[in-house]
């Protein structure tokens, strides 16, 4: 009852609204004769579309608005009474035409009645399913006559419409006015057997044609309300002119207040009844003209299709189903000349009508209709009027109207072309705009190649386009490994063989890559894989065939011209100090002269190295055979002596491991001028020394015991300086260490006896380091020979070495020659230590731990030790104290594990910076003292803070926390040595390093920091020996460039870290599930 009252209240409120729901007819005479009793009692719940220019005075009617649930209820008495009785009385009292704007996607094509044709037979009531939720008027058997209009562009067009019987569907959602009948949308095909409307499609049902309201003005345009295909019946043309005259006076009497709103809404909803599926399925079985379909969705222009009079003899109606019209034929058919997407040809293409138009109707070819004789042709021909909406077409399309129809608007010039099947099939290009859009049509030619592509502009006032294209697989990218980032490769991984990159380098840095490119110019390098087949022997052969021999000869001649002036100047400055040293000085002067031609300045600091050029290396073939061998890759080290008097540039070229110098004896002009016997002895001694040390400086590690024959200091020096090219692990034998100490002390003695004002005694401050490893016998004999000489002759020879920008790695600094003392060698070469401290190798226990991050050196310097071999070695060496080698497993410490007191009392742990480098400070006291500072200190839980950060005892705590389902054991140890081996050790090391620099730089500014007494280096322990915490060696003075204060990070434990408690059950919380 409450819903009934609400429904009547709602209807009353709508009745009192200003003329919004009033009944009206296009014919004012018929609307004035209606009474309130004859008016409809039922109105749609949503206001329908209307024509605002012809509104009669409002007429009261009985309430017809109901709530939705009452309309949907089958037992609604109000619905049944109002919809039938009032409608029948209304239709019976309205013999003339009543208005109806209908929207459907099913269109009726019927034969136009003749002039004298009587009224059509009554219509049977349509069949409605009981479950229909649509609210619309049901038509009785009474028929309504259709008022036809015929207007010219100078007049307003007829606004009368025919009412269509209610068809199964839904209410049109529109706004603005109410009509006698509600607008419905056909959801199913009326001819379909599943639509339950087979009776409604009989030949006697739809005798009322669908008349389109063809007003094309923007103010009064019922055709703008919705798209429809309307058949214009020309049979009452003359009678309709009188009706037009009668309506013209009353059409503009009154304007509805909701007109502007309704027009805007209706324009936005013109194609609302057509979904995408409808448009796709429009013409799969249809041959309808595409211009007819295009005109169906626009209301401002007309396209006419005329048929012969022979179609009047047919009695059955012709149903044109809009769902059968499609764009398929325009996309794929051979009849089309261009795609329809965004093209004005869309309106000029033709399709034959659907097969559902029976009895041969509309089969004749279309003909043009002239406006002057249109009345005569309307009596004999049927014209299909299609309303077009020009809202979007005004902006996109420009059409010609060859049928002389009136224009869309008085201000518009866009006209529709007649549908000509022959012209479209033959590709007729009479349309003036076909040529203008040829380029646009080409953009859509690939629609057939895509899986789905539909683009239909001008229908929904928007463009919907979905395209799926097969995309080819992209080409795989080629990446160059980082190991070859310095090489020059093109896109095909081939080496660049031109000199462009070398010339660019010369312009920027004064450097040249001629040697690198020369080595790459070899015919053996054709592909990327050929790089792996290169060897040093191939490069040596390529060096002999270098094309720079002419340049070398030129430089030799130019040098010989200036040699006399240079020699006179040199002799005047140095007096008698040039006799025995002229061999090295001549070579050095020649090479320095060649440098000055390119660089124009000597090498005084680190940045001067970047001004060097590799081109000058090609001119060094004038070196002696022994000297070229000394600087080749076959020579593992650089020997001191007179023949070692090579320029700075020559020594620095060792960093390029590809350089192999030829033993070309272009050295004769210097030998002729210096024929002393000492030079011959020195040269032969150097040659013999290099030959003797070639085999001894390449130790091989083939078994576990060979690890102890490797020297740490030599491996550190070679790994930092990069001179250990053949020694991949950076290893030097113990004999080499003794040779280093002997030869270095010799250099020190000679450098101190050098005059301070000697121009060549100044040591260039560069961060490079070399290792000098002569044999013991040759070094001692050479040292004794040099010591017995006069001294002045050898000073120049020694100064040639001190003049080089290398740091001489040595652990000796004493005023006395300690090389003859057996105690010196015993102290320097302490007995071999057990692993891991001595060999700096790791013992892998197959644990998943962060072992690599704790090693401050590259993993290439480490050895993989077989545990079985290590155990065998320990048994032979009587090392049974396996407590020192145990690595505590992660979370695997036994509960009663007792840490050894010896490790805790070890004094070495106070100053250890890393467990890998321990034991070097007090080696002379106890060679085996660093055993306790092995990986136990890193991986053991001893000395680490626990969660509570509280006081610790020497032994682990025995207490446990027993909960309901688990037992947690906490391990605590004393905290007295935690700070010594962790955070404070870094501070202590830095303080020691600062004091070391101060002590070194106060008394001596020129002397290399590595040439010091062994006691001074041993006192400094790890920091003085293991220098690779620095990018550049820390032993150099502080005046070098770049700065030496940058340190590499050392992974260590800090006090901030703690261990988690060990839980003896898998569950971590009380409520956590247990494992099965």
From Swiss-Prot:
The modification Phosphoserine is found at residues 275, 354, 403, 407, 632, 676. Residues 419-450 have a biased composition (Acidic residues). Residues 1-11 have a biased composition (Basic residues). Induction: Repressed by zinc. Keywords: Cytoplasm, Phosphoprotein, Zinc. Belongs to the ZRG8 family. This is Zinc-regulated protein 8. It comes from Saccharomyces cerevisiae (strain YJM789). The lineage of its organism: Eukaryota, Fungi, Dikarya, Ascomycota, Saccharomycotina.
